Amino acid sequence: MNIEFLKSIVENKFAVPDNYEVAELTLKLIENLGAVEWELRDYSYMTLSAWIWGWYDRTNYSDAEMLELAEKAKCNIKIGLGEAENDGVFLRSYSILLLSDLTDFHRYHPYLGETEIRDRMELYLTYIKREQDLRGMFLQRKDGHTELLMLLML
């Protein structure tokens, strides 16, 4: 999956391309959240968000699939948490964005139990407490978004 492919999805109002399944694309989109290339991260996150919220139609995920997405995001957030000055911040920060979308979606379409909501809140607080990579900008790379994310989670 390259930037041009992702741009074509965005330009087509986030329609799933012919001959592709949401499930197979989702796995690659999640992997792209940790990409060093900012466009690959941004377009991948935008596509996942659009498919969660159903910007132009309806959500592309069932409740069970959204829970699976959340589990992947939660695992990604923990990878390298507490380390500083490495590219793992991309995966963590974009996974926080994804988890935030999945959690916020619950307000409009309840699908989470109380335990899951509490677990996510605990993870957000752990992230705020342990994230060490607080760079606002990377040389030659788009920002890691860490400080902004911490404010949004509060």
Where are these regions (language model features)?
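N-terminal alpha-helical scaffold/docking segments in eukaryotic complex subunits
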Residues: M1-S62
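A Lys/Arg-rich helix-loop hairpin that forms a DNA/phosphate-binding surface
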Residues: N60-A70
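Eukaryote-skewed repeat-based solenoidal scaffolds used as protein-protein interaction platforms
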Residues: E68-K78, G82-L154
